[in-house]
């Protein structure tokens, strides 16, 4: 009886049951979204996914978020500024100068609450990221190292395949969309004779006492190289810094990834001839040899080849050169490699076709302007590793830049997979000027990701209203309708922030006389960051975007307007900023965008066949300012309106209101009375 009852368990149904219950053979959990890495970019995407109520998981190899910052930068000082005071209460404006905070709805999760230092300690960033994940309840699986990623084709999947992730324990995870936010983690190494003698930035001592009285050679010329030099500048005999390219100063290139002033002490001692120095040479043209005393000698590689040795500096006479004053003829005690970082491609199967970009060697994966891999649909690169889109152009490789590009990617996917159109505000055309003025004066995404993210204004039929879309990737402009779910049938404006085209570069003198302009007619020659408005009658095509003029962020527009640069980055001057902008918009739309008092609208209604939009959308709908005696008098005195009251009544009213302060018969508004449509002041 017992045997007969147990027998079915060993038959085909029982076998299937056993297979289904076996953990190693069970179907892996399937999620809509997977995020690799719980650094700033990964947590930022997790926040947006959670707010949208999406199914997601974050995989982090370390026990806490932000593991990169537990070790780097090696000398513990961040170069992202923590400007706690701006004199403004506007939270969006303040993010322009907060380079460390992630975006969230919780004001407690601003980095200003975690450090008072202008250049914070990396430990504060670790603490901040931990609180960000914990406070918001982000779904992070810690101590989970994804060791392999491959594809599994499936017609039912969103993108025609699922991403299969295998962790260090052999557990398998499936997801429809994969976000890679692992940063750049592989030290860049150049192979040349003697390269094995170089200590890496990732492992070299950070104790200055270890360098006392030594001659040091640093390979590289980025912030990590100068950071290393700054730490030991006061204890070494001298420091020589060698790189194939000239030094790039961030204040000259306007790129925050170039050398920052906080690390440039070596430039002082070099130019003031205090033993330290900079040298330019391709590392592959040199060789480093070690002598019997443990000293390192640098020589041109072809001399080494002629001597037919690569073992010891004692076997040939060093240094060798055509001249006897070879710059690096003194031996070095230490050689330190600070050549930057590359993306780790090792965990990705070839089926993903996650190739490196040709222009960047192995540094970055090849992605589109939408941050999606060119090889696999549904695979997105976030954070520092996505910097190929705007390398040395904008801030996309840093927190204060990629927090906005991550949001843009999330918005693209909300429409692609959940039919949620790109967020937009629809307003009457009378609000067009004020909407642009507000955004260029406070928007942080436009300000930080200049030339990459831009606001797009989609005009409605007959230009009676518009939709305002914020921070759209401008290189995807031709696909705007497909990517956002919005229509651009009646023309559009694009608001971008730009530096002058000839103002940025490692060889530029950015402190020359007359480096800025202040007159409206010279706005197109503005050098410093300023708003530029592009008008298109039709949405540009992909071909127009691809073959746009050199160094232009967008195709040639129907019309273009530069708002003149401002020393205070405050574009609210009525005559210098707002009036030229409004006139430009009016010319593009062939309409009047001024605001009018009710009396003017009443006059227009009696004398014109077509009213200005402000009167159509306001006055005729019983909207606008309610007239009072004091307001009426102010308008007349300001010559915004003609005083149509009978002369006797006007004089009588004037006498009653002014008493002995004004002679009887003196006109209320000095000078010729002007119609409202001709008033210069009403132009404001």
From Swiss-Prot:
Glycans are attached at residue 143. It is found in: Endoplasmic reticulum lumen. Residues 1-26 form the signal peptide. Residues 649-684 are annotated as: Disordered. Residues 663-674 have a biased composition (Low complexity). GO terms for cellular component: endoplasmic reticulum lumen. One of its GO terms (molecular function) is monooxygenase activity. Its main location: endoplasmic reticulum. GO terms for biological process: ERAD pathway. N-glycosylated. The keyword Oxidoreductase applies. It holds the Pfam family Pyr_redox_3. Its cofactor is FAD. A motif (Prevents secretion from ER) lies at residues 681-684. Keywords: Endoplasmic reticulum, FAD, Flavoprotein, Glycoprotein, Oxidoreductase, Signal. Belongs to the FOXRED2 family. Probable flavoprotein which may function in endoplasmic reticulum associated degradation (ERAD). May bind non-native proteins in the endoplasmic reticulum and target them to the ubiquitination machinery for subsequent degradation. Interacts with SEL1L. May interact with OS9 and DNAJC10. Interacts with TXNDC16. This is FAD-dependent oxidoreductase domain-containing protein 2.
């Amino acid at each position: 009886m017992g045997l007969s009852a147990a027998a079915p368990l060993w038959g085909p149904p029982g076998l299937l049951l056993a297979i289904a219950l076996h953990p190693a053979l069970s179907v892996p959990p399937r999620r809509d979204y997977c995020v690799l890495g719980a650094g700033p970019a990964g947590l930022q995407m997790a926040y947006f996914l959670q707010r949208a109520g999406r199914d997601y998981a974050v995989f982090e190899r370390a026990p806490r978020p932000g593991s990169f910052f537990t070790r780097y930068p090696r000398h513990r000082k961040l170069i992202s500024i923590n400007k706690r005071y701006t004199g403004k209460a506007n939270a969006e404006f303040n993010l322009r100068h907060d380079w460390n905070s992630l975006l969230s709805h919780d004001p407690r999760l601003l980095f200003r609450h975690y450090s008072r230092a202008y250049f914070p300690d990396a430990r504060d960033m670790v603490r901040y990221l931990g609180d960000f994940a914990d406070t918001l309840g982000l779904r992070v699986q810690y101590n989970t190292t994804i060791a392999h990623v491959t594809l599994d084709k499936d017609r039912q999947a969103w993108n025609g395949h699922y991403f299969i992730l295998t962790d260090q324990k052999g557990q398998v995870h499936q997801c429809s969309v994969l976000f890679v936010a692992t940063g750049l983690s592989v030290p860049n190494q150049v192979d040349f004779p003697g390269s094995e003698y170089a200590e890496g930035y990732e492992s070299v001592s950070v104790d200055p006492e270890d360098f006392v009285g030594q001659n040091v050679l640093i390979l590289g010329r980025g912030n990590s190289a100068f950071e290393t030099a700054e730490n030991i500048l006061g204890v070494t005999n001298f420091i020589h810094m060698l790189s194939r390219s000239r030094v790039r100063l961030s204040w000259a290139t306007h790129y925050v990834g170039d050398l920052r002033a906080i690390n440039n002490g070596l430039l002082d001692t070099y130019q003031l001839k205090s033993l330290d120095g900079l040298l330019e040479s391709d590392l592959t043209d040199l060789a480093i040899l070690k002598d019997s005393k443990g000293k390192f000698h640098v020589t041109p590689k072809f001399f080494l080849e002629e001597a037919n040795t690569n073992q010891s500096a004692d076997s040939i006479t060093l240094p060798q050169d055509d001249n006897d004053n070879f710059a690096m003829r003194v031996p070095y005690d230490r050689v330190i490699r600070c050549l930057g970082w590359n993306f780790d491609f090792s965990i990705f199967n070839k089926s993903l076709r996650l190739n490196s970009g040709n222009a960047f060697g192995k540094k970055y994966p090849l992605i589109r302007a939408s941050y999606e891999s060119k090889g696999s649909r549904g695979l997105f690169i976030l954070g520092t590793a996505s910097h190929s889109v705007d390398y040395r152009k904008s801030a996309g490789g840093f927190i204060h830049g990629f927090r906005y590009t991550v949001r843009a990617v999330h918005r693209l996917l909300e429409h692609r997979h959940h039919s949620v159109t790109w967020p937009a505000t629809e307003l009457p055309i009378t609000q067009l000027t004020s909407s642009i003025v507000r955004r260029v004066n406070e928007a942080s995404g436009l300000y930080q990701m200049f030339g990459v993210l831009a606001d797009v204004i989609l005009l409605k039929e007959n230009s009676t209203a518009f939709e305002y879309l914020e921070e759209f990737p401008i290189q995807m402009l031709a696909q705007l309708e497909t990517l956002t779910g919005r229509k651009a049938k009646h023309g559009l404006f694009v608001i971008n922030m730009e530096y002058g085209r000839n103002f940025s570069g490692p060889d530029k003198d950015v402190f020359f006389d007359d480096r800025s302009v202040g007159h409206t007619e010279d706005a197109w020659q503005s050098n410093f960051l300023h708003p530029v408005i592009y008008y298109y009658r039709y949405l540009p095509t992909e071909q127009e975007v691809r073959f746009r003029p050199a160094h232009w962020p967008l195709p040639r527009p129907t019309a273009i307007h530069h708002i003149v640069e401002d020393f205070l980055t405050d574009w609210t001057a009525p005559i210098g900023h707002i009036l030229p902008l409004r006139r430009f918009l009016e010319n593009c739309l062939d309409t009047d965008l001024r605001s009018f008092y009710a009396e003017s609208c009443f006059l227009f209604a009696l004398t014109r066949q077509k009213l200005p939009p402000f009167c159509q959308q306001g006055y005729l709908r019983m909207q606008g300012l309610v007239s009072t005696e004091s307001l009426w008098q102010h308008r007349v005195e300001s010559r915004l309106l003609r005083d149509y009251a009978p002369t006797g009544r006007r004089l009588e009213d004037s006498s009653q209101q002014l008493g002995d302060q004004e002679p009887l018969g003196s006109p209320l508004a000095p000078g010729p009375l002007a119609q409202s449509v001709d008033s210069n002041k009403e132009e404001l």
